[in-house]
Swiss-Prot record:
GO BP annotation list: fructose 1,6-bisphosphate metabolic process; fructose 6-phosphate metabolic process; fructose metabolic process; gluconeogenesis; sucrose biosynthetic process
One Pfam family of this chain: FBPase_C
Gene that this sequence comes from: fbp
Subunit organization: Homotetramer.
Sequence similarity: Belongs to the FBPase class 1 family.
Name the UniProt record assigns to this protein: Fructose-1,6-bisphosphatase class 1
Enzyme class: hydrolase
One of the record's GO cellular component terms: cytosol
GO molecular function term, any single one: fructose 1,6-bisphosphate 1-phosphatase activity
Pathway listed: Carbohydrate biosynthesis; gluconeogenesis
Entry binding sites for substrate: 106-109, 196, 262
Length: 330
């Protein structure tokens, strides 16, 4: 089996980007170690702090954020970073070539119940000139690399550098990420959907109708039965979609009119959308392709519908839009 470093060489990924990816991977090994130790190391539970989203931070949110910041500062290739746990962008190295956006511990509410969590990251080119928030406001099409690390029964890294999606598994003895799936592919059709049904009454009418039709199964207009899955961590739900197909959605809702969207564009939706498109799936807000959105702020939120291409098209048809064309992977 190829190691991650060997794989990057075989794909002719340039040296500096390879170095950055390896730094992210090495840091994820340390995060995996911290997650595994959990209560034994006294790192479970919440703090009294809130992040910029107004969400109470878990102890491991802060610990993993600091681990990634420290590693990226030492790497030398990073111009700046943006994190779910940082109010503002952080300048790293004046000579860095890349910007890194990340969610250090996606699904951290699952930590205290020993369920799935992960790290999501996105790598963008660093524009010339002074580093400001505007430097980061690039569409998802500009991503040079994206991926996530899933901390589950095995620690797994899903990665794209624009050449498909590869899956690596952390070997528990050698502590190396080894290539275990050279070409992840999302089946175009599915009978699985992932959504937080407790918000049903707050969704827009198109999504309410779409889900209602799925629940009708064979006797409904879709003429087939669907199963629902929900992990409550985007990283886990998207991993399932990449592994065996499905549709994942966190749609617009009016539960809190000031926050109609849940997921963040720059370090959740964009990297996951790139992975999904590179694996043959589609990713949309319901009204536009996620990777084509021009961001307006670092912590911008969007609706997310992604997964098996034909099922995403079916969902979008309820929104009155035909997205039947193949996604652009330039």
């Amino acid at each position: 089996m190829q190691t991650l470093a060997q794989h990057l060489t075989s794909k002719a990924v340039n040296e500096s980007l390879s170095q950055l990816i390896l730094t992210l991977a090495d840091t994820s090994k340390a995060i995996s170690h911290a997650v595994r130790h959990g209560a034994l190391a006294g790192v479970l539970g919440a703090t009294e702090q809130e992040n910029v989203q107004g969400e109470t931070q878990k102890k491991l949110d802060i610990i993993t954020n600091d681990m990634l910041k420290d590693a990226l500062k030492a790497d030398g290739t990073v111009r700046g970073l943006a994190s779910e746990e940082e109010d503002h962008v952080v300048e790293v190295s004046a000579n860095g070539q890349y910007l890194v956006c990340f969610d250090p511990l996606d699904g951290s509410s699952n930590i205290d119940i020993n369920s799935l969590v992960g790290t999501i990251f996105s790598v963008l080119p660093a524009p010339a000139g002074e580093l400001t928030e505007t430097s980061f406001l690039q569409s998802g099409r500009n991503q040079l690399a994206a991926g996530y690390v899933l901390y589950g029964p095995s620690t797994m890294l899903a990665l794209t550098t624009g050449q498909g999606v590869q899956l690596f598994t952390l070997h528990p003895e050698t502590n190396e990420f080894l290539l275990t799936n050279a070409a992840m592919s999302i089946s175009p059709d599915t009978q699985e959907f992932a959504i937080n049904m407790s918000n049903q009454r707050f969704w827009e009418a198109p999504m309410q109708t779409y889900i209602a039709d799925l629940l009708l199964g064979k006797i409904g207009p879709r003429e087939k039965s669907f199963n629902m899955r929900w992990i409550a961590a985007m990283v886990g739900d998207v991993h399932r979609v990449l592994s065996r197909g499905g549709i994942f959605t966190y749609p617009t809702d009016n539960k809190d009119p000031k926050k109609p969207y849940k997921l963040r564009l720059m370090y959740e939706a964009n990297p996951m959308a790139l992975l999904v498109e590179q694996a043959g799936g589609k990713a949309s807000t319901g009204y536009e392709t996620i990777l084509d959105i021009q961001p307006t702020q670092i912590h911008q939120r969007v609706a997310v519908i992604l997964g098996s291409a034909n099922e995403v098209d079916a969902c979008l048809s309820y929104h009155g839009i035909d997205y039947s064309e193949e996604p652009t992977l330039d």
